């Protein structure tokens, strides 16, 4: 299923005909270029490898630069793959534009969520914390017991504890496409999407429709 790579610009709002406001995320979709076409005969599966944007040669390693030069494609800021039908008619160097999403009502968007650093259990897992008074000393935000005694003599895997929060690859499905601005290459999506401003997003047309509700 072919998709496109976009860059998150930020959030704003637009208005319906009845005057109600809709929160939207603005995504900039610059031209995506096909760097490589993988075929079942050689690679074991059928897909296209795409890039977007531009990048200085001094900021990339030689193996990636060689990969782009071999296929005579301008160096982009990353590489992404999309599985496609083996009979699809694509070619190296082909430009995939925002026109791909014309007549598409819903999309799935994948991105890297905002990193929150090392977080405690109250922020990370929504623990309610311990008593504010009644003998509590310096343990107001502590997680409490993390196990039993000699039996089982260990902390079970998956125990909710403090640790790194955020910066995960997340996919939000069935998001409405509110508007497509072909002139400025902008895609307006209803609601929020993973990632901070300036982060790259993978945008794909939906396969499963969970609702026929429209704006």
Swiss-Prot record:
One of its GO terms (molecular function) is rRNA binding. SUPFAM superfamilies: Translation proteins (SSF50447). Methylated by PrmB. Keywords: Methylation, Ribonucleoprotein, Ribosomal protein, RNA-binding, rRNA-binding. The modification N5-methylglutamine is found at residue 150. Residues 132-151 are annotated as: Disordered. InterPro entries: Ribosomal_uL3, Ribosomal_uL3_bac/org-type, Ribosomal_uL3_CS, Transl_B-barrel_sf. The keyword Ribonucleoprotein applies. One of its GO terms (biological process) is translation. One of its GO terms (cellular component) is cytosolic large ribosomal subunit. Belongs to the universal ribosomal protein uL3 family. NCBIfam families: L3_bact. One of the primary rRNA binding proteins, it binds directly near the 3'-end of the 23S rRNA, where it nucleates assembly of the 50S subunit. Part of the 50S ribosomal subunit. Forms a cluster with proteins L14 and L19. This is Large ribosomal subunit protein uL3. It comes from Wigglesworthia glossinidia brevipalpis. The lineage of its organism: Bacteria, Pseudomonadati, Pseudomonadota, Gammaproteobacteria, Enterobacterales. The gene is rplC.
